[in-house]
């Protein structure tokens, strides 16, 4: 039904092969009483995700067991937490591949919803996102020591990897020179308490319904780290320099806009584990790293 495991070069075509995935998904649906006629694949995501009208099945390739462990840990941790997140319905294995069944949240991803929103609606949505971030950050982190990455540890991980990561993600010599200058001039970051962070709140992981936040999805990258880190992905992929939305995001998060905070947020926008600087600069129409960062977080 499924291969025992798949290296990355074999997984990519398998991820696109809907018919190869179908027998496993139908078996899971039958096991948990989901209507097989409603099963349909999702195109987004690293893992294999299918859904019915009310539920979502997420099938984890055994190649990355850490993703599975974190996602399941977070789904269990967030049950009853009062956050707009999928609720865990079942978990198991099929042919050695772990999976979860969870509730399906309503709404569209941000790239589909944002262009249809006026300035007031965007401001409300950004405030909703910030408030949900604050709610997540307020949850206890007891028992999550394995996910701990305090600010200095995270910086120690990210700084040496920046140039190589961005080269692999489409950066050229000109960008590498700018990134090296960025590293050479990296200022002290605002001290930040370690809290529970989703860590990948890009536009694809935020759902919108009727102009308001419907929920956060995909917690496989979550960890316990500096609260400032959480704002980086959302600033790059959602508010994208829109001043009203930016202010609303910070207001919803319950933090004051200070020069020190803005400097820190610019730094995390570059140093984020999943930052694609060349792509983001190109989309924003900037050849200069510094001008792009200035538009992300205006004073």
Residue locations for each model-derived region?
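Phosphate/pyrophosphate-binding loops and the adjoining catalytic core of nucleotide-dependent enzymes
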Residues: 1-15, 19
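Helix-rich C-terminal or lid/interface subdomains of diverse kinases
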Residues: 18, 44-47, 221, 226, ...
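Short, surface-exposed acidic
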Residues: 35-39, 172-176, 255-265
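ATP-binding pocket architecture of kinase catalytic cores
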Residues: 38-150, 191
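Active-site acidic catalytic loop and adjacent metal/ATP-binding pocket
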Residues: 45-53, 57, 181-231
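Short beta-strand segments
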Residues: 58-60, 89, 196-199, 217, ...
């Amino acid at each position: 039904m499924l291969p025992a495991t798949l290296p990355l070069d074999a997984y990519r075509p398998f991820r696109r092969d809907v018919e190869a995935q179908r027998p496993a998904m139908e078996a899971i649906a039958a096991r948990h009483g989901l209507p097989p006629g409603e099963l349909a694949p999702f195109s987004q995501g690293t893992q294999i995700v299918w859904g019915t009208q009310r539920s979502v099945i997420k099938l984890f390739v055994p190649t990355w067991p850490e993703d599975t462990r974190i996602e399941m840990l977070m789904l269990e941790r967030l049950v009853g937490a009062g956050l707009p997140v999928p609720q865990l319905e079942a978990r198991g294995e099929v042919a050695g591949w772990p999976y979860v069944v969870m509730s399906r949240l309503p709404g569209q991803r941000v790239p589909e919803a944002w262009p249809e929103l006026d300035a007031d609606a965007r401001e409300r949505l950004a405030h909703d996102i910030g408030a949900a971030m604050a709610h997540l950050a307020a949850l206890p982190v007891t028992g999550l020591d394995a996910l701990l990455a305090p600010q200095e540890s995270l910086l120690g991980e990210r700084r040496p990897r920046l140039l190589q990561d961005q080269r692999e993600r489409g950066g050229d010599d000109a960008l590498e020179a700018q990134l090296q200058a960025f590293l050479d001039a990296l200022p002290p970051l605002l001290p930040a308490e370690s809290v529970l962070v989703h860590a990948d709140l890009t536009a694809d992981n935020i759902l919108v319904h009727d102009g308001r936040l419907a929920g956060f999805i995909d917690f496989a990258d979550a960890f316990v780290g500096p609260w400032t880190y959480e704002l980086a992905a959302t600033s790059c992929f959602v508010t994208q320099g829109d001043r009203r939305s930016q202010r609303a995001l910070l207001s919803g998060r319950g933090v004051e806009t200070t020069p020190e905070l803005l400097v820190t947020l610019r730094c995390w926008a570059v140093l984020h584990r999943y930052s694609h600087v060349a792509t983001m600069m190109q989309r924003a129409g900037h050849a200069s790293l510094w001008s792009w960062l200035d538009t992300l977080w205006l004073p």
